[in-house]
Amino acid sequence: MSPPKNCAVCGDKALGYNFNAVTCESCKAFFRRNALAKKQFTCPFNQNCDITVVTRRFCQKCRLRKCLDIGMKSENIMSEEDKLIKRRKIETNRAKRRLMENGTDACDADGGEERDHKAPADSSSSNLDHYSGSQDSQSCGSADSGANGCSGRQASSPGTQVNPLQMTAEKIVDQIVSDPDRASQAINRLMRTQKEAISVMEKVISSQKDALRLVSHLIDYPGDALKIISKFMNSPFNALTVFTKFMSSPTDGVEIISKIVDSPADVVEFMQNLMHSPEDAIDIMNKFMNTPAEALRILNRILSGGGANAAQQTADRKPLLDKEPAVKPAAPAERADTVIQSMLGNSPPISPHDAAVDLQYHSPGVGEQPSTSSSHPLPYIANSPDFDLKTFMQTNYNDEPSLDSDFSINSIESVLSEVIRIEYQAFNSIQQAASRVKEEMSYGTQSTYGGCNSAANNSQPHLQQPICAPSTQQLDRELNEAEQMKLRELRLASEALYDPVDEDLSALMMGDDRIKPDDTRHNPKLLQLINLTAVAIKRLIKMAKKITAFRDMCQEDQVALLKGGCTEMMIMRSVMIYDDDRAAWKVPHTKENMGNIRTDLLKFAEGNIYEEHQKFITTFDEKWRMDENIILIMCAIVLFTSARSRVIHKDVIRLEQNSYYYLLRRYLESVYSGCEARNAFIKLIQKISDVERLNKFIINVYLNVNPSQVEPLLREIFDLKNH
């Protein structure tokens, strides 16, 4: 066993060579950040500091000089271009290695198959004929052969292995779920064309056990869900639309699973409709969200080839709904997007809670609709075929600021439209069940829903019931275990924010000599405040890295989300540490006189950022900004914003953000009463939009400073170039 190594710079424990010298991880990172920087360090002491584990923070100049003296080479530091080339090379080699492993596995598998009893020449030629006869198969085969130079017999073996026509449902699902890291490649091999995709899904859905195994996998890996949809939609835009359409409703997961179990043939039929007429299929889903009967009419028209006439469309709902098979194709339409529910699967808080609610109320609600539809209209304005979410918001939430048509990804309109739909979906069947119980007990009596009175008149209550949940249903508003785990993860991740900042501030003050007295562009105190934000951002980065969903994303997306969202997270977090009495931010410092940073320092910045910040703080209800759970969830919402520049997997990020929107709503419901919780949710969504607006003012402050006077981390985040 080799003796332990010590860092040649500070004496700390070292693992090996870094940039041509034995150093610890701290000195390696310090050298990588500062060796190529144009920033000029100065020693605050005698120009010959003794660098140890303790003192290495206090003098950057002597530490950097010692790094160079022991032989660390700055030319060994990789540029961004070099890093990108290396990353691509690693991915290429990894892909080649997987192809070779798959080819070897295929050859081994072929030895045990019955078809290997045939003559090898016949088998090889038949497989080659199969590839030459299909354009898609040719493209797939050429890619494999280009990356992995197999012989003719080896090339035919993978083709035989991934031929879905010769595989059982169990083997198909095994290939996808056995190795989640390679599931995407398995889907590409199994579904090379639209027809193959339909054949594979038909075979899987016909086996209930294997279908549920696949559903479970897709809930955990939503990217694979989107890939499968795109295989038979043949259009990335339409596939993404279908993928996201059901994600925001917590009740769809239960419906999808139950319909796969009840009527698998209808699910396959619906997927075929998606393939041939995706526009109509999307229309079906939109209608089915709010009006199952309307969805059935559209579905029947498509299934019959568009032959349904106007009389059939306007006929009484009862004959349609009385047909049990007719009910199932619509819900299987949802069911086909079991993959779609993967968004909620990616959000643990959603499916466990709503499974308990919907299994009890939703299925009977759909099944019993025929008995009430003819004599009692659907008791929700949302169930009207003419229902429009945007119009409903403008009429029922007119106390909110006017909504612009050009709204951002986190705007109140874009989120509220999804939230309101979730509300109707979640309470639709519950309130119908409640109304049926009331009618049986007392006809014509006046009922009260959560404090909102409804008259005996049938039309008037229908306009008011969606506003408040029925008080007759005692819903369990406590967070379930999955939701608590997701919230607990945020709490644990935020522990880094509470570490004392003594050492960070000391190191920061040592570097303040870079602020030139003759530079009158900015006040020195404002520059200190700007550099202090680097300490906060470093801690927010540590927090983000402890969130599982963020950690599982590719490095490109992680960098893009942090560069675009760190200041918004900092703004959101700052409202919690703001002291109204002192008009200052409280920081975790052991010395009380160092633990407060006055907000009036913002007055030295250009523009009216101080006034905007005060407006933001004063309009943020104290009971919300003092609730750490709310602030942490909102930090996660602004972090997972798919509109950031240079983001690659926007759909996955949007999926994760929606899960935190849902967690915020559920948490508010567990703390406040029904109407108060919804009002709080709407107001908090508006605050997220306000954060985006305030962030633009703050970014302008960073862009107007001299890059040589700010921390390297800030230069990297805001792409500041040294003058």
Curated annotation (Swiss-Prot):
Pfam families assigned: Hormone_recep (PF00104), zf-C4 (PF00105)
One record GO biological process: cell differentiation
Keywords carried by this UniProt record: DNA-binding, Metal-binding, Nucleus, Receptor, Transcription, Transcription regulation, Zinc, Zinc-finger
DNA-binding region: 4-79
Compartments where located: Nucleus
Region (Disordered): 95-163
Gene3D superfamilies: Erythroid Transcription Factor GATA-1, subunit A, Retinoid X Receptor
Coiled-coil regions, chain positions: none
This protein's record includes keyword Glycoprotein: no
SUPFAM superfamilies, alphabetized: Glucocorticoid receptor-like (DNA-binding domain) (SSF57716), Nuclear receptor ligand-binding domain (SSF48508)
Induction: By 20-hydroxyecdysone (20HE) 106 hours after egg laying.
GO molecular function: nuclear receptor activity; RNA polymerase II cis-regulatory region sequence-specific DNA binding; RNA polymerase II transcription regulatory region sequence-specific DNA binding; zinc ion binding
Zn-finger region bounds: NR C4-type: 7-27, 43-67
Highest taxon of the lineage: Eukaryota
Biased composition (Polar residues): 122-142, 151-163
Domain NR LBD: 483-723
This protein's GO CC annotations: nucleus
Role, per record: Binds selectively to the HSP27 20E response element.
Family in the record: Belongs to the nuclear hormone receptor family. NR1 subfamily.
Name of this chain's protein: Nuclear hormone receptor HR96
Organism, scientific name: Drosophila melanogaster
Gene designation per UniProt: Hr96
